[in-house]
Amino acid sequence: MEQRHTREEKMAAFGRMLDVLDALREKCPWDRKQTNESLRPNTIEETYELCDALMKDEVADICKELGDVLLHIAFYARIGEEKSQFDIADVCNHLVDKLIFRHPHVYHPSQIGAPNPRPLPYGEENDEREFAKVKSVEQVLDNWEQIKQKEKDGNKTVLSGVPDALPSLVKAYRIQDKARNVGFDWEERRDVWKKVKEEITEFEAKVETLYNNAETEEAKAAAKKHATEEFGDVMFSLINAARLYKINPDNALEHTNQKFIKRFNYVEAKARG
């Protein structure tokens, strides 16, 4: 891997960004006015712009959008510092200590809080600590959830770590994945297809009731409610199938969106002559 910048240059660039942010916070009316609440919508927008660049694999845009997201992280830290709550060093140190704690196969817990954390020798054979030995990515993921449960301020339940504000499709995937990490999953992944077909059949029956058998407005409202619930079950089961076959459903749907847009634009252009 070619090194574009030295460690010193990277640290200097980060410090340069903090210096500029400090100046903007003091001298720019717009930057000075911002709060956590006012920045939040912009943060969401910048995150989606980064996701868009990642999906399109546009390197220049990825670099640009990463900078925008990084600015927001530093901005929130600056606001926290002004309130004497925390600063960017606290953010970084908390992250590093969490990573060390959650990677016992890479770091000994004695390295938590160390200025220069030192990883364990590769393939340490005499380390009998819990979670210290892993042989696969799946084992790392399984250990991850169990380790999080042991944290002092960790999640009290398996699913409490899933943010309420996640988009529903992503949220469903995370719920299922977290449940899998504690053993709640299909014994055979092919068994999920029976569930998918069952949910589609139930949805079809409710839709037929809605459009063919419901005569009163009250009956139509009830049928629509049930059909909506059944469609949710269909979506949840399809997301489960995608997960079991190691397909990210959000990425898959976005690829289809882009494919449709490309084809539609082509048809539209031809129609215009």
Give the label of every model feature segment.
Residues 1-65, 71-116, 121-231, 235-273:
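Flexible "arm" and connector segments at domain edges
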